[in-house]
Amino acid sequence: MTQRKNMYSKKNSFGRSDFPEGFLFGTASSAYQYEGARNEAPRGESVWDTFVRKYPERNCYSNADQAIEFYNHYKDDIQRMKDINMDAFRFSISWPRIFPLGKKSKGVNKEGIQFYNDLIDELLANGITPLATLFHWDTPQALEDEYSGFLSEEAVDDFKDFAALCFEEFGDRVKLWVTLNEPWVYSIGGYDTGRKAPGRASKYMNEAAVAGESGLEVYTVSHNLLLAHAEAVEVFRNNPKCKDGKIGIAHCPVWFEPYDSNCPKDIEACERAMEFMFGWHMDPTVYGDYPAVMKKSIGKRLPSFTAAQSKKLRGSFDFVGVNYYSAFYVKNIDEVNHDKPNWRSDARIEWRKENNAGQTLGVRGGSEWDFLYPQGLRKFLNYAKNKYESPKFMITENGHCDIDYEKKPKLSNLMDLQRTEYHKKHLQSIQQAIQEDGVVVEGYFAWSLLDNCEWNAGYGVRYGLFYVDYNNGLKRFPKMSAMWFKEFLKREEEIEDSEEEEYVLKSTMNKKRFLLATGSSASCFIPKMSESSKALELLF
């Protein structure tokens, strides 16, 4: 055993202690994707409820009425977080669960408030720091019906009322907040390509779309989202209960590399792509205005801020949330069809999975856009640090997907070596950015604790550290990635007592790699792992 301890001593490996004191490690979720209980707990309709029911063929014939029933199982799931040594959890507060009809004046759901109070209290009782997201795409359908949601500036005041109530009810205990989750995705997907709720786009962008105007509505919606963010931050900073709290936007940058590294136009296109994707929502919160390249390209279709709005937006964040998954090559486009405007043609870019030499950026994951490129996260953090005068960052999402529409055997889903490697390499990139580059990163949230309803991709895409058996009562089972995090996150005082367990884990992973290479059966090498007090087995 002495030799084993020397070989696998935690002190000589990568772990929690390699990060700054107080660095948060957690997992992320969203209300629509997790909560479920649609038919038993009061909640108003969201645009996603309507979209998936109205257009099932555009949503893999799935909905989130049940989701993974986090509403009823959150206590057990919090024990799972605790069991793998996580110390934070990011969740979203469902706007239509709090205001079923979208407006405070039309009724507040006390049961919804109680649910989030109970969730927050349970997290804190288990030593887990809550991070709450106010808007994770679930616009109340009532507001969509009344004034077309965020296409109207009326949404700003209703969102402000929602945010104010959340700060008042939960701000004494929740000290980390995200106003908007991925405004780029919400605007592009919902109003330019029409692939996500509410599914609006021009016919030349999406034949299935029944209404919308690509290249116009996308900018209007993002503009109103930014105004709503600024109002919410002002309310937050004026509420005594939120004293010492921090707030920001969860952006979703993709890192870009030039399609042809020797082509000046492709190199320039990478910078333009970053401005159109990240700068679009970041610049207004720093400088009070959109990037110059966007204003020049889009012209009158891009709304402008008043002096008062600009002032309110500047400095409206305490940290920059980063949802990073992958990277792409970018090719410059010289000529575009101005009669068919859209975000990508305005940016004059084309995303490519391979460069001019036929190379990908890394190993492909479960989806066509999911490439393992952890150095892209480090490059992005340095890009944003240098451009925006060293803000503080929070990695609010980072994850790897498996595709499971064919219902793969449970074993192959649980032995998620590629996901384990994905998280490890991205954490290494973050650690390098902190220690070698001087980037200030304060936390990391893996997407996601559990497999869940992945929006219009349904349940066939799995991101969880825990496997959810959709055909067996939504039972949860830890994957190898959960086991890895459990070991990675052990604190120094826990290490000496766990070296034998760690040896078994590492031996199993090495044997599994060998078995994958040789095609042999893996069943005899799978270790057992107790899950909290329930003593569930990893595999059975």
UniProtKB/Swiss-Prot annotation:
Q: Where's the active site on this chain?
A: 182 (proton donor), 397 (nucleophile)
Q: State one molecular function term (GO).
A: beta-glucosidase activity
**Pfam families registered for this protein in UniProt:** Glyco_hydro_1
List the GO biological process terms. carbohydrate metabolic process
| Reaction(s) this enzyme catalyzes, per UniProt | Hydrolysis of terminal, non-reducing beta-D-glucosyl residues with release of beta-D-glucose
* InterPro entries cross-referenced by the UniProt entry: Glyco_hydro_1, Glyco_hydro_1_N_CS, Glycoside_hydrolase_SF
List the residue ranges forming a coiled coil, or say none: none
Q: Which UniProt keywords apply?
A: Glycosidase, Hydrolase
The UniProt entry, under PROSITE patterns, shows:
GLYCOSYL_HYDROL_F1_2
- Family, as annotated: Belongs to the glycosyl hydrolase 1 family.
Q: Which PANTHER family match?
A: BETA-GLUCOSIDASE 27, GLYCOSYL HYDROLASE
Record-given protein name:
Beta-glucosidase 27
Organism from which the protein derives: Arabidopsis thaliana (Mouse-ear cress)
Organism classification, top ranks? Eukaryota, Viridiplantae, Streptophyta, Embryophyta, Tracheophyta
Q: Which gene encodes it?
A: BGLU27
